[in-house]
Amino acid sequence: VRYESAATLVALSQSAAAIRAAAACYVSLLCTASDNNVKLIILDRLVDLRQQHDGIMQDLVMDVLRALSSPNIEIKRKTLNLVLESVSPRNVVEVVQLLKKEVLKTQSKEIEKGAEYRTMLIRAIHQCAVRYPEVATSIIHVFMDFLSDSAVTSALDVMVFVREVMEKYPALRHGLLMRLCEALPTIRASRVFRIALWVLSEYVESPEEVSLSMAAIREALGPLPLVGLRGGVTSGRAVGGK
């Protein structure tokens, strides 16, 4: 009944008050409905409303994010897409803080498709940081913990994000370089390792940074030489992944 009432309200009136009331009704249903198909339909209606009435969802973004509690990955994906289209300077800090908490939750093995969900969250936060650079400094150090993620996509997204932050915020470089040196020996994916090496070679400047970087690289490589006298691989640490 509430769904039909909201749909009727949208059909009969295009006033801002009517659209806001309908959107609030949809969001309330989104958070209380138990059927995943119903949630997906409601998300589609909210997307339509946002497209027709730009800005209407900005005050409801935090309520929409409650739908992330659903274990269904498609509901999570549609919710994040809707939120990214509705984020604004007024709510971006709150949005990013909530998404950061969700990222930390994905470390639990109890979360279904945790690696895929973590990748979605990291990319969502990355997009927010690109559009609103002021939020980047509040989350970048948390992200560094995921450079050793076994999910290559997540780790790669984090490394690309770190590289962008270093490029745009020179004042943050030293701290991030130190964290990167700490994380380097734990990185598992070769693609992530390559970007990390590029970042170190590009932004390391002081003798202290050079010394720490070289020590981290040596630790990551393992005992030398990497190849024995007859071409056999020694016990040196290999970085895996694609």
Please annotate each region the language model reported.
Residues 1-242:
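Extended alpha-solenoid helical-repeat scaffolds
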